[in-house]
Amino acid sequence: MIEYIKGEIVELTPTRMILECGGIGYELNISLNTYSAFGNKTTGKIYIYEVIREDAHLLFGFAEKIERELFLLLTSVSGVGPNTARMILSSLPPSELVQVIGSKNEAALTAVKGIGLKTAQRILVDLKNKVKPMESMAGNLPEASVSNGAVTEEAVAALVMLGFQKAASQKAVSAILKGSPTLAVEQVIKTALRML
């Protein structure tokens, strides 16, 4: 099991990071929160969770241990896989997710793509008591900003990687930026995730 990798950030998109360590480039699947935390950095330490399947070995990276712990809790719920857990963590920062689960807020969970009412209820029931110890640890991850010229392109690319259609993603991102042109890419994506 890999606890963390420390190295140079070679490539960073809202859903993926390439981290070079010891001459090896590790491809990491990341959430939007992790992207925000590493937005302007060239090196970093990222916590890892490894998923081994018959057809693939995947690495999921997290800026903070609490985000990884929430990921593990989410994937322990029946019907929630790694990509769905990443989608939830991209839509809700760790502190907000802990609050949502603690207050049994079904609406906030069903607003996430791929989460229906039954899955949301299952998450709330299964994790209600497990997140209580995390409430004191939960804090907002630092936010990073990206130049406005790349916001549309990056946001659309991230939404497409998360499984949304390109046309719908472009329409949502354009509408968001029309109303708030100074938003950072991660805020645009979070808003779009709630719209789509």
From Swiss-Prot:
Region of interest (Domain III), ranges: 147-196
Keywords of the record: Cytoplasm, DNA damage, DNA recombination, DNA repair, DNA-binding
Record's subcellular location: Cytoplasm
Stored SUPFAM superfamilies: DNA helicase RuvA subunit, C-terminal domain, Nucleic acid-binding proteins, RuvA domain 2-like
Flexible linker: region residues: 142-146
Entry keyword DNA repair: yes
Single GO biological process annotation from the record: DNA repair
Region (Domain II): 64-142
The protein's name in its UniProt record: Holliday junction branch migration complex subunit RuvA
Organism field: Parabacteroides distasonis (strain ATCC 8503 / DSM 20701 / CIP 104284 / JCM 5825 / NCTC 11152)
Gene: ruvA
